[in-house]
Amino acid sequence: MRSRPCYIPARMLRTLWAALFSVVSTITFSTATIILVFVRAPAHLVERVINIWARSIVWAAGIELKAEGTELLDPNQRYILVANHYSYFDIPCIFAAIPQPIRFLAKVSLFKIPIFGWAIARAGFIPIDRKNRRTAVKSFDMAAQRIRKGNTIVVFPEEGRSRERQMRPFQRGGFLLALKSELPIVPVALNGTYDVFRAGAKTITPGPVTVTVTPPIPTVGRSLKDKESLAQESRNRIGRILFGESFAENDAPTKDEEQKDEG
């Protein structure tokens, strides 16, 4: 009796290829970053390496990346970017699409990954443990230091990747940081990464992703009490881009409905 041929779905092959490529690319560019920081190379070289890494990851996943609204950003101004969070690919898409020296608040476990963790630590990324309030406050202090060194900070105010398309309520930490530093807040919508590789997915589905930058929201002259209204305005802007003008301010899951992945 002849055995049946074993067919591997094309999507699985793409996922395996992207995973292997991403590992090699991440090790290569992480090593380059460590070396550049060690020899005190100009900052723009580090930014260039990060950008090439991000574009290589986007390419390997078969993402057709489109950026909209980046002309709204002043290259001489730094910002607090706030974005929805669906996928591991959100971060490389933001790096590849937005022409700013960006640093993220990243979960502390990423800094424990050999080579990659060393690279992001030396490049000035900021570890945050949201389960520990004291260290979380310290992380926002570190973010303020990065701002003074000329970096734009990206915050995912949902605090984790959502398993559903629906956005969760925005937490206030990033908006307090913007108010204290008096930097403009820029809501950024990531549309498409949920379909490419959402939280809990096993395979990558290549496709289009659009990163939409909205007009900066000034914070100069506003008080810390404005954090609630700023969070709601930012969430509404992103929601209308993702779901249309019918997006409601209270369109958020309850605690019982939330499905959260710590990614």
Question: Model regions: which residues?
Answer:
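Non-catalytic C-terminal accessory region of glycerolipid acyltransferases
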Residues: R2-P5, P9, V137-G263
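Short, flexible loop segments at the rims of nucleotide/cofactor-binding pockets, characterized by
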Residues: I57-A60, L81-V82, R130-R134, R163-R165
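Membrane-embedded segments
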Residues: Y88-K138, M142
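A transmembrane-helix-recognition feature enriched in membrane-embedded lipid enzymes
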Residues: R4-K66, W118-R122
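Short, basic, glycine/proline-bearing loop/turn elements
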Residues: A54, F125-D129, G160
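Conserved H-X4-D acyltransferase segment
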Residues: R14-F21, I50-A106
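Short, hinge-like loop/turn segments at secondary-structure boundaries
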Residues: N84, A121-A123, T203-P206
